[in-house]
């Protein structure tokens, strides 16, 4: 029993792998990328359940082309049916002596020819309508071209009509470009002159202001250079008063920053506090 079960298991696994490989077999049109992403068993399972759809030979092409085949079929079907009914309705009893049957067949043929003639008339009418529409469209196009000023008649009269028109257009374009360049040059010249005048005015104004401010500052420095608030001049007053003044804020703290330059504000010596 155990050996039989083992054999059955082995057969089942082998059959499963074989079926799996058969389902995943590669076709001629498939690539490796599609083989990874596709699930092939769907096609084999549903191939017979859902047969492929067939396109019927319907009236799609005839409707798009507009050749009137439907009208011919609609118009010709009743006539053929009537002739067939008439032909079937004839019997030996109805046919008289002397070739009445032949006359009946001729009547049927005449009816068929009449229906074909009617269909031919319809085709000719449709062709005439199409030709009229094309002529109207051509007339409209010619009118549009004449309105735009480039009619075919004017160009056809001269041997090189198109070339002359193109040359005239190029000349007009060149003239317009030259005019635009001249206008740009004039505008640049005017802007340059205006900017130079403004620069000269601003420089003169700056010089006048500098002269006025320097005179006032010198007067202020001369007044305040020898004083240190309410104390007045001391023994250790500045000996270089003849030099150009540099401002009261600098002269008041020159000795402090010169003597204690290498120390921080928290490392002032006793001399600083004693002199204060």
Swiss-Prot record:
Residues 106-119 have a biased composition (Basic and acidic residues). The keyword Secreted applies. A motif (Cell attachment site) lies at residues 116-118, 228-230. Residues 54-251 are annotated as: Disordered. Residues 145-165 have a biased composition (Polar residues). The keyword Iron does not apply. One of its GO terms (cellular component) is extracellular region. Residues 189-200 have a biased composition (Low complexity). Keywords: Biomineralization, Cell adhesion, Glycoprotein, Phosphoprotein, Secreted, Sialic acid, Signal, Sulfation. Pfam families: BSP_II. It comes from the Eukaryota. Binds tightly to hydroxyapatite. Appears to form an integral part of the mineralized matrix. Probably important to cell-matrix interaction. Promotes adhesion and migration of various cells via the alpha-V/beta-3 integrin receptor (ITGAV:ITGB3). This is Integrin-binding sialoprotein. It comes from Gallus gallus.
